[in-house]
Amino acid sequence: MRYIPLNNSVYKRNRSNFMNEMKGNSLAVFNSNDIYPVSADSELPFEQHRDIFHLSGIDQEETILLLYPPSKDDRTREILFIRKSDNHTKVWEGEKLSKKQANELSGIDNIYYIEDFKAVLSSIATKVDTFYINKNEHYRANSPVETREDRFISWLLKKYPAHNVAKSNPILQRQRSIKHPHEVDQIKRACEITRKGFNRVLKFIKPNIWEYEIEAEFIHEFINNSSKGFAYSPIIASGHDNNVLHYIKNNKQCKSGELILMDVGAESVSYTHLTLPTKA
């Protein structure tokens, strides 16, 4: 990773806050995002699901977090499942997190490899009445792509049809809107990296440059400051493309006398900055 991880006390607090709002005799499960293929042997860069990152600090694919607050055994109150490195993985992708590393990042003591998940879930599911599931409930969510979380929820409800279901999303929406001081520090850092990017670009812009050249200046500054890169697809729209809400082609030449609209932000430890003050 390019960033210094947050202290795991942040994630311990986040998990504790979430579990305090869960109904009695229930458990919650959170899944990482998929890695999406683009051809026979190449993939898009991995982006962790923000909710499981908020609760664990684990930035790795094939990760599952299980929370079971009623447990009388601390070993089953918080359980993390991670991908196991094999020889093929070590050669082609590099080492995945060890259990020790996952513990240091998350503050979770009980860690299994992901192939043990269904057996562990089965041993706990018979003891609870309610499953908390984590569906995307954003009012603009309309993607036809079935996520890893979607597949898990379909499997879970078919496997355990007699259990009640509760929603994790309303709890997380409330809790994620209140940031820990360490999280605020990362937002400030994202702001500072973004500021450096804009300062660099303002010195670079001149008539007849191309929008993608401006994009290149931003990404140079972001990565040079240990950011993962753009927090979202950058919008660099000159001329009449100012009027397009989500113009991301960035392939036009910027003519003299035109305005350039830029909607760009850097990411720092999965945090970003999207707002500007009206007076600065």
Predicted regions and their residues:
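Anionic group-transfer/hydrolysis microenvironments
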Residues: 33, 136, 239, 263-265, ...
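Hydrophobic alpha-helical scaffolding
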Residues: 4, 8, 142, 177, ...
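Single conserved hydrophobic/aromatic residue that forms the stacking wall/gate
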Residues: 273-280
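Short, well-ordered alpha-helical packing segments
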Residues: 19, 26, 35, 188, ...
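Acidic/histidine-enriched ion/cofactor-binding microenvironments in catalytic or ligand-binding pockets
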Residues: 56-59, 155, 242-271
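A composition/biophysics-driven feature that prefers long, compositionally simple stretches
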Residues: 1-196
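Active-site pocket-lining segments that scaffold enzyme catalytic pockets across diverse folds
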Residues: 182-222, 226, 232
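Short, basic/aromatic beta-hairpin or loop at an interaction surface
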Residues: 229-240
